[in-house]
């Protein structure tokens, strides 16, 4: 019962969509209405408002970190922490407060990993940064980081046959699944690069007047 309650609370925390909230607070259009239509930091960046994108990134990462930190703060066993990690991540993907139209989970997963093991989170984030820097594709960076996260967990930290290790693997699989459309675009050479605002403009612009 305790695990179920903790997972439910984590899911509700994950359901808070900072992309939508920050955009509304700053007078920007709903990120689900332009660009990739994904309520995440990369799409918010297409609005041209870097501050909004940074706030979205930090907020989404923080909620992932917070849920796992709370589980550990209250002394919950690893199996409970694992379910909390998955629940907050799923909450971001399918938020009950926003008609289950969520993001792809990159920032939230990073927050979860930082809470699970700070070095694991940093190693995964560094992987994302390196790929993003050289290739300028957020989706490609996310996919590579998702593949390497469980590898880092097993081979760098020796986490094997542990509920949290399985949670990390589950998040990685879900993250790759959520990027299946991006994979098709990457293969077709049609994926937008980081900072590309063309799609936002073509879809009516991201500045002002958007309804949430």
UniProtKB/Swiss-Prot annotation:
Where mainly located? membrane
Family annotation (NCBIfam families): glycerol-3-phosphate 1-O-acyltransferase PlsY
Cited InterPro entries: G3P_acylTferase_PlsY
Q: Name one GO cellular component term.
A: plasma membrane
Q: What does this protein do?
A: Catalyzes the transfer of an acyl group from acyl-phosphate (acyl-PO(4)) to glycerol-3-phosphate (G3P) to form lysophosphatidic acid (LPA). This enzyme utilizes acyl-phosphate as fatty acyl donor, but not acyl-CoA or acyl-ACP.
Superkingdom is Bacteria
What's in the keyword line of the UniProt record? Cell inner membrane, Cell membrane, Lipid biosynthesis, Lipid metabolism, Membrane, Phospholipid biosynthesis, Phospholipid metabolism, Transferase, Transmembrane, Transmembrane helix
Entry similarity comment: Belongs to the PlsY family.
The pathway noted for it is:
Lipid metabolism; phospholipid metabolism
State which Enzyme Commission number(s) the record gives. Answer: 2.3.1.275
Classification of source organism: Bacteria, Pseudomonadati, Pseudomonadota, Betaproteobacteria, Burkholderiales
What is the topology of this protein in the membrane according to its UniProt annotation?
Multi-pass membrane protein
First-level EC class: transferase
Q: What is this protein called?
A: Glycerol-3-phosphate acyltransferase
Reaction equations catalysed: an acyl phosphate + sn-glycerol 3-phosphate = a 1-acyl-sn-glycero-3-phosphate + phosphate
Organism whose genome encodes this protein = Burkholderia vietnamiensis (strain G4 / LMG 22486) (Burkholderia cepacia (strain R1808))
What does the record give under GO molecular function? acyl-phosphate glycerol-3-phosphate acyltransferase activity
């Amino acid at each position: 019962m305790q695990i179920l309650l903790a997972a439910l609370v984590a899911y509700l925390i994950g359901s808070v969509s900072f992309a939508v909230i920050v955009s509304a607070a700053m007078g920007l259009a709903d990120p689900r209405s332009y660009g990739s239509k994904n309520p995440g930091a990369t799409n918010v960046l297409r609005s041209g408002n870097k501050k909004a994108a940074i706030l979205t990134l930090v907020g989404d990462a923080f909620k992932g970190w917070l849920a796992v930190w709370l589980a550990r703060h209250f002394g919950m066993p690893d199996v409970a922490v694992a379910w909390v990690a998955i629940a907050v991540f799923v909450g971001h993907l399918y938020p009950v407060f926003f008609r289950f139209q969520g993001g792809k989970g990159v920032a939230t997963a990073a927050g979860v990993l930082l809470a699970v093991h700070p070095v694991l989170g940093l190693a995964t984030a560094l992987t994302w940064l390196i790929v993003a820097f050289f290739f300028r594709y957020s989706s490609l960076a996310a996919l590579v980081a998702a593949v390497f996260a469980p590898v880092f967990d097993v081979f760098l930290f020796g986490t094997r046959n542990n509920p949290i290790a399985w949670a990390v693997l589950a998040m990685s699989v879900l993250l790759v699944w959520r990027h299946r459309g991006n994979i098709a675009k990457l293969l077709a050479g049609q994926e937008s690069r980081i900072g590309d605002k063309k799609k936002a403009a073509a879809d009516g612009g991201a500045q002002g007047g958007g309804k949430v």
